[in-house]
């Protein structure tokens, strides 16, 4: 069992080194029966202003647009259809950003509204544009307030929930810490709604099956993400080398306590070395378009020696994909090794599989590259959150 002093040291180290922070605020924190809870927003903005005084940069990922719209329109329950939800978001988004603007104006801080769909991050050019815009806003001392563009989004381009979006924004901005504020005190060792003796787990060093079992998917009446979705977000960011803390946004001074290194919430420590921004994009933003099956030698070269994938080690493939597409690399037992961007299309790879690189031009009449996947464009499975999309 990890001692209290060691946990305190870990928390202090994480807090002290967090110069750029993404703070995700859930609907259960921001909204009440009367709509957006201005008292909560004012309190959080007060705490965030103190973080700014400490020299930290802050990005907010804010839920609450749909919930705010529901209250403003006078609906008694969550809309059932997509058009109704999108209309509620259109009504509520203005109220939400206005609340942030007014709250931060007391501290002479400015905000900028950023609305995204997953399409904006899947496309590499748009991903870089979003990254550069966020970086510029932070350089100007402005606090970006990010949300999914619920008004126009469809299922095919949804992030799923703002927990997932916050993980992607933490990677996009190369943040030092992701803080997820919810109406729970952290990750419990059992469901606190059912077990009176349930206690918060102070620190998680590795998200394994036991930890996953602690998470009960119990979204609030207004939100879409429960503890399971927060755990998936934690897996994404910690796999990329970024710590995450889940804390109770309804508690006064929760951010002050977190950044003072106090034992509040659950701290998820990084599971590996920090990935480059591009590798984070490959690992957690893109959806694989096909599979490449490798022989034992190629699989070992990718997994253990950090080599690029050459055509000679390919024994099969599945799917239709073009140059630059993300594909999964599997060993000959169909186990996922990782994901990479291909320098050749599926049709081209089918023609050159199993042959040496010096024969590619003879077969195709041209050669894009010696490598089918360059090691700089490949991410091992261990650095990828193991969700259904990738495995």
List the predicted regions and their residue ranges.
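C-terminal catalytic "cap/lid" subdomain
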Residues: 2-77, 82-110, 114-391
């Amino acid at each position: 069992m990890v001692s209290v002093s060691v946990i305190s040291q870990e928390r202090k180290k994480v807090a002290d080194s967090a110069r750029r922070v993404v703070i995700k605020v859930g609907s259960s924190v921001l909204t009440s029966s009367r709509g957006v809870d201005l008292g909560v927003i004012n309190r959080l903005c007060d705490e965030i202003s103190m973080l700014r005084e400490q020299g930290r940069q802050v990005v907010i990922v804010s839920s609450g647009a749909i919930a705010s719209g529901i209250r403003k329109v006078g609906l008694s329950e969550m809309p059932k259809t997509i058009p109704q939800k999108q209309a509620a978001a259109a009504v509520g988004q203005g109220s939400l950003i206005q609340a942030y603007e007014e709250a931060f104006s007391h501290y002479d801080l400015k905000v900028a509204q950023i609305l995204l769909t997953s399409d904006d991050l899947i496309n590499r050019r748009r991903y870089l544009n979003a990254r550069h815009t966020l970086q510029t806003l932070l350089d100007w001392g402005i606090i970006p307030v990010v949300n999914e563009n619920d008004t126009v989004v469809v299922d095919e381009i949804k992030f799923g929930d703002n927990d997932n979006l916050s993980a992607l924004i933490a990677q996009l901005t190369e943040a030092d810490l992701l803080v997820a504020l919810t109406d729970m005190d952290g990750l419990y060792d059992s469901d606190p709604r059912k077990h009176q003796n349930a206690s918060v787990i102070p620190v998680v060093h590795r998200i394994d099956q036991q930890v996953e079992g602690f998470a009960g998917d119990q979204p609030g009446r207004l939100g879409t993400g429960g503890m399971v979705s927060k755990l998936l977000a934690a897996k994404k960011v910690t796999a990329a080398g970024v710590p995450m803390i889940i804390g109770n946004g309804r508690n006064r001074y929760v951010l002050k306590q977190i950044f003072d290194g106090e034992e509040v919430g659950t701290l998820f420590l990084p599971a590996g070395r920090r990935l480059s921004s591009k590798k984070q994009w490959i690992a957690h933003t893109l959806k694989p378009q096909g599979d490449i099956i490798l022989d034992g030698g190629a699989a070992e070269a990718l997994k253990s020696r950090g080599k690029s994938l050459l055509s000679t080690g390919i024994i099969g493939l599945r799917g239709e994909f073009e140059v630059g597409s993300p594909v999964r690399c599997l060993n000959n037992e169909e186990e996922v090794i990782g994901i990479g961007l291909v320098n050749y299309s599926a049709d081209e790879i089918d023609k050159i599989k199993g042959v040496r690189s010096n024969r590619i031009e003879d077969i195709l009449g041209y050669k894009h590259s010696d490598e089918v996947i360059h090691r700089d464009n490949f991410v091992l499975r261990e650095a990828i959150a193991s969700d259904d999309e990738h495995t």
